[in-house]
Amino acid sequence: MRYITPRKAAEGLGSAHEGTQHHWAMTVSAVALTVLTPLFMIVVARAIGLSQEQLLAYFGRPFPALITALFVIVGMVHFIKGTRIMIDDYFQGGTRKAAIIFSVIFGWAVIAAAVYALARMGLGAIVVL
């Protein structure tokens, strides 16, 4: 008689055979967003009403820039993984491939734009592209 754990019985099930890894990735990013969202709200609340020079100086400090960057990166990776599952469930064929490509490109473009903007604010005139 063999003893099979519930995890072993569930492993490999599903059409993609990677549901466990995806579930853990989504869970970890959701927990990270649970911590980062209130911190990001505090950062944004403190930035409201600042002049442009004060805002550049504020995001030039490490804590606000780091919290903002982490929030955008973790949030967009969570978005990419979530939209991938939604697209896999509701689209077929070429439309599925196009939608996945669009959502991944969009997510990484938002991450790149946010990190570039934070680097420009934090480093000032040093970063020129």
Curated annotation (Swiss-Prot):
The chain crosses the membrane at residues 23-43, 66-87, 98-122. Gene3D superfamilies: Fumarate reductase/succinate dehydrogenase, transmembrane subunit. Heme binds at H78. One of its GO terms (biological process) is tricarboxylic acid cycle. Pathway: Carbohydrate metabolism; tricarboxylic acid cycle. One of its GO terms (molecular function) is heme binding. Its cofactor is heme. It is a multi-pass membrane protein. The heme is bound between the two transmembrane subunits. It holds the Pfam family Sdh_cyt. It is found in: Cell inner membrane. A ubiquinone binds at Y90. It comes from the Bacteria. Residues 1-22, 88-97 are cytoplasmic. Keywords: Cell inner membrane, Cell membrane, Electron transport, Heme, Iron, Membrane, Metal-binding, Transmembrane, Transmembrane helix, Transport, Tricarboxylic acid cycle. Part of an enzyme complex containing four subunits: a flavoprotein, an iron-sulfur protein, plus two membrane-anchoring proteins, SdhC and SdhD. This is Succinate dehydrogenase hydrophobic membrane anchor subunit. The lineage of its organism: Bacteria, Pseudomonadati, Pseudomonadota, Alphaproteobacteria, Rhodobacterales.
